[in-house]
Amino acid sequence: MNPSEMQRKAPPRRRRHRNRAPLTHKMNKMVTSEEQMKLPSTKKAEPPTWAQLKKLTQLATKYLENTKVTQTPESMLLAALMIVSMVVSLPMPAGAAVANYTNWAYVPFPPLIRAVTWMDNPIEVYVNDSVWVPGPIDDRCPAKPEEEGMMINISIGYRYPPICLGRAPGCLMPAVQNWLVEVPTVSPISRFTYHMVSGMSLRPRVNYLQDFSYQRSLKFRPKGKPCPKEIPKESKNTEVLVWEECVANSAVILQNNEFGTIIDWAPRGQFYHNCSGQTQSCPSAQVSPAVDSDLTESLDKHKHKKLQSFYPWEWGEKRISTPRPKIVSPVSGPEHPELWRLTVASHHIRIWSGNQTLETRDRKPFYTVDLNSSLTLPLQSCVKPPYMLVVGNIVIKPDSQTITCENCRLLTCIDSTFNWQHRILLVRAREGVWIPVSMDRPWEASPSVHILTEVLKGVLNRSKRFIFTLIAVIMGLIAVTATAAVAGVALHSSVQSVNFVNDGQKNSTRLWNSQSSIDQKLANQINDLRQTVIWMGDRLMSLEHRFQLQCDWNTSDFCITPQIYNDSEHHWDMVRRHLQGREDNLTLDISKLKEQIFEASKAHLNLVPGTEAIAGVADGLANLNPVTWVKTIGSTTIINLILILVCLFCLLLVCRCTQQLRRDSDHRERAMMTMAVLSKRKGGNVGKSKRDQIVTVSV
């Protein structure tokens, strides 16, 4: 075989791989398990909560106790990691039963309403014109016109009689009322000049008894300036209405039925015959357009009024005052002057002017009252949150103490387009309700951030590296701390605002009640502040409840209390009636429930959950602090040095004493030896030379 053939049959040479390192790197990256992919349904893990960390600490402590291992920070950490690994690795059994824990919860400002009753304090009703209607003004209402007239069906309960206006049982009936200023004249044919305003008001119950007077009640007379019987001096030269509150001689009864008795001590002027000094039979019948059955029709069509008689006409109860109804039976409540502002704005007011003339007929004086009107003014009255007006076919049922209304409308303003075929019910937002809430874990209170900070302060401010160890704990407390801080700032700001508004309102009442023109912008700002105070008052009451209660750590908008819900003691029908606002014998006893919950909260205030565990962890972390070690070593070295010095001193003293004893012993031995040598010699030193004696003695 020639060399060329041998060369052709030789095996081919292997090519060297230059990319062995990249292949090895890829082999190292190969895995046999399934690749973990992030799915759209995958949720981001939340930071550990305080309850989870506390439970983990408890489980780790129990595990170490069962295994009889000393509880050190290192062993606690390893036990906690082992428990977490077991919990994560073990699958959740399908159909596992979830424990159910039901506690009482306080929900502030729920989306519920309740009726404003005669026992509530008067509310703020704003008008757009304070020249003809006294009271706070605001021409920017409604605040949200797009929300006016929203449909609603209500079924709510009440304890005290609710405030309702309209033609329905349990509601105050509307009527037309006149307010007149009487100015005397000196003309021989004119006795008085009149300026009068007619508008919608509240209808009294009229009993045509002797002299056709209204039925009056002399009970529950309020304190105040009585209305004058004669024309006030300040009214003799004025042509404008000056509203001034006064108390009439007797009260008008506005309602007296199964819903209660409501009276009004405001004056209600009317024309009557002055029969003083008359020898003939003088009819004392009162003729007044104050009460008209046709309501708005009398204000629209009747533009001229004339009264004629052979006897002089007099206007009774000379003061211009607004109605102030109040309930006196079955309970006695405060006056509500704001209701008149709602009724007077339901239709325009009419302005009248006229006089009373004196003529002679059949040789007798003849008196004529002539009133004419050519001016009407539309008005608007509004309420602001948390108050609202429910308008519709309202039905009040006193037997069941419920109020129902289907297809009603929610309004905040009433104007001259209102139809009195409907009724007006004043409502407001509920301040808070108590309801049972179900949880899948036991109730646990929030840890005390103050105690936690005090316990860990010595660790955190000495060793910065421990901050990374405590990140998990602190992350669970950020939400609680932020909530507490915001609540504290809100309370502080609210108190400051209340004081500021109270200081600013000292001189505002006289300004609002006067008829002089005021700056509209300033008035709107003051009204906003007044309404803000009312709203903040409700918020402060809710915040006060929150401060008195111990709440679960995982709630911020409402408070889950430690009081367990007992179905046998408070069945759901009682809770339902409470949500409806009904308060009767079958309704949830809120006062008793509050007392039980406050007692349970007090019991939990003395026991701050997790404090012992936190203190143990802090002590363990403090032992790991190198600074502590250095301090311990330093203090131990000083003590040891002192002890060593003392020992050395004692040892030196012993050595010196030993040496001295040895010297003394040597001297005694030498002396004894010398004595022995001398005693063995016969004759002693006799016959010896002096030198030999000295040598012998020295030896």
UniProtKB/Swiss-Prot annotation:
The organism is Homo sapiens (Human)
| UniProt signal peptide | 1-89
Q: What does the PTM comment state? A: Specific enzymatic cleavages in vivo yield the mature SU and TM proteins.
Family, according to the entry, reads as follows: Belongs to the beta type-B retroviral envelope protein family. HERV class-II K(HML-2) env subfamily.
Disordered, as annotated region: 1-47
Region: Fusion peptide, residue numbers: 466-486
Please identify the protein, giving its name as recorded.
Answer: Endogenous retrovirus group K member 8 Env polyprotein
Which residue ranges does the entry give as Cytoplasmic-facing topology?
A: 654-699
Q: Identify the GO cellular component terms for this protein.
A: plasma membrane
